[in-house]
Amino acid sequence: MKLQFKVQQYQTDAVDAVVETFAGQPKHDGISYRIDPGKVRPVTAPALFEAEERSDAGLRNAEIVLSGAQLLENVHAVQRSRNLPLSAKLASSAAAPGAPNLDVEMETGTGKTYVYIKTIMELHKRYGWSKYIIVVPSVAIREGVKKSFDVTAEHFQQLYGTKPRSFIYNSSQLHELERFSSDAGVQVMIINIQAFNATGKDQRRIYDELDDFQSRRPIDVIKANRPIVIIDEPQKIGADKSLKALAEFNALMLLRYSATHKVDHTKVHRLDALDAYNQKLVKKIAVRGLTVKGLAGSTAYLYLDAIEIAKTPFGKGEQNNM
């Protein structure tokens, strides 16, 4: 059974929010560079059948040529069209210092994964950017994202005349990185945060010089592509250690997609729970609160000042005994 996907305007609006931020950026179908060949072992005797020589030609994302002032002007235009507060400046972060850090807020169940896949295709169509990394907080989400790429491939082929090639990063299948670097098409690497911020030997291979990778470090091959990094559910990846690890990717820009951003950056789109309900995108929303009965002005009260969202949520209160 084939799934049929319908273009939804509210999803297109979320795509356009990111794409229009870079209005004026010229289209460039990748910048050629030489992939680090690593250390090649000398051949002591000619083989009967020579293997095909590996190409060292790579294609990386072109740099953003817009100035900070131009980007901020574009951001303001996007924010005005969506009734969002205007950003005083472009936000930076430890995960992508000096690069655009954009937040897209979308309520759960409104097709967030579809939106960022379509954003990838639209950024490639308009500006030529073709190298992407999607960072997810768990293996389960990683597998779900890969499945989304697989089931939408034909849909995007029909829309754009091409489809993204996606793969899950695996430190034992590093030939995928060679193809990621050299292929001219849309390349998407999906990686869970544990693959590069954990301390185990297998997880740390991304930072090691590997004999089976011509004594190169996988992270160096990745960062040479100047990838666009997309974080799915960033509030689950917010530890300082993880943010510093993300900086190793040398991101051209960082796009965050979530219904509940814990830290705000440059917000370019918002589809919150109430918006989703009003547009009939979700069936219902629930609001949890306190009900107070029989409270007179002369009686004591308890005032809830704030709620801290952490692993164990807690509230800050104020008691007045009058």
Give short role names for the model-derived ranges.
Residues M1-M322:
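RecA-like P-loop NTPase motor core of helicase/translocase proteins
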